[in-house]
Amino acid sequence: MKGISIRELELPDAVIGKLLKLAVEDKRVISLGPGEPDFLTPKPLRDYTKKIVDQGTHYGAPQGNSELREAICTKLRKDNKIKSTPENILVTCGSQEAIYVSLLASLDVSCQVIVPDPGYLVYRPAVELVDAVPVPLELREDEGWIINTDRLRRLIDKKKTHGIIINTPSNPLGTVLDKKILEEIADIAVEYDLYLFSDEAYEKLVYDKKHVSPGSLNGMEDYVVSFYTFSKSYAMCGYRLGYVVGPEKLVQAMTKVSHYITLSAPTISQLVGVKALSLSQKYTEIMRKEYDRRRKFIVQRLNEIGLPTMMPHGAFYTFSRISHLRKNSYAFAQELLRKSKVAVVPGTEFGRFGEGYIRCSYATELSKIKIAMDRLETFVKKKI
């Protein structure tokens, strides 16, 4: 039997999957690991799904349902202040496919892409899968986990760098980049003629701040490629529906690539997506307010316990320092799971600069978070 490809063997193992598998198998475990809403998909969308299933299913157009792309244009103009046409939009199987096909369509072998570190665990492997080179941009707690543009500029190789990936609001950090820093990053992208890949999966889950889309900035139409998903805003994770908006030439190339990978996003999901974009924002706001309540509680408890944690302003994660207790974040998470039955994600899942930290998700009901914090406190007291 032939072996496994070198490409696959060089991919990092997803530690998060192993830990969460153990959490599912042991009913005593409280998991603060999930990266998905704990809410049901809104009832109007569930009811509509049942209705359209009876109409049958067929393959869809590779670029996506035209009615959905029109609805996305309206949403982008209203919510994100991004001007677009249906030709600038590709509907995908979640934002992860959007990220992957954008890299496939824009990068050649050995091109470099700057990725945030700590950053969403998909970025580095996605870049490597297209035989390009991820260049980690260190984010620091003492800088508020905000991108340092001087450090960013120093990483750029005029011949090799082709793009920068940013994520606002951030997974795992919860940071929300303001307009000023986005304008500085945008100026760098224009100066060096780079794509600015903007992952905005958590755009609707912002607290105390305002979400700004880089694609709304003046003069960025030919540079910004923005990724969105229905998973977080509408609790539609299982529908696998997302979309990307960017320069028309690149989007057409992405459509060609996507055609040979998935053919099209699920047609049922796309029809539900049209319905979702017509819904009242009250459904998203109910989730956002509940996450906000949990956010304030868990951050206060983590700091009381002795795990320094900055207040996140978006998404539904905290990123806490544990280096004063144990240098190895994976060992800390593994021991916490084994001894205290609490599952968290080690910071190294998000890059080497995540060492010494753990990520907790507050996409878990508050009563469980309270129990998990009590268990964590007992665990930490034994470590001190």
Residue ranges and their predicted role:
Residues 2-94, 101, 277-279, 382-384:
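N-terminal small-domain helix-loop-helix segment of the aminotransferase-like
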Residues 105-127:
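Conserved PLP-anchoring active-site segment centered on the Schiff-base-forming lysine
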Residues 135, 139-208:
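Active-site phosphate-binding strand-loop segment of PLP-dependent enzymes
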Residues 154, 326-328, 335-344, 350-384:
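PLP-dependent enzyme catalytic core of the Aspartate aminotransferase-like
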Residues 222-292, 296, 300-302, 378-380:
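Conserved core segment of the aminotransferase class I/II
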Residues 26, 130, 159, 191-192, ...:
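Helix C-cap/helix->beta junction micro-motif
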Residues 111, 132, 191-194, 220-222:
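A short helix->loop->beta-strand "cap" motif at the edges of active sites that frequently abuts
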Residues 274, 290-299, 309-322, 354:
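Conserved glycine-rich beta-strand-loop-beta hairpin in the small C-terminal domain of fold type I
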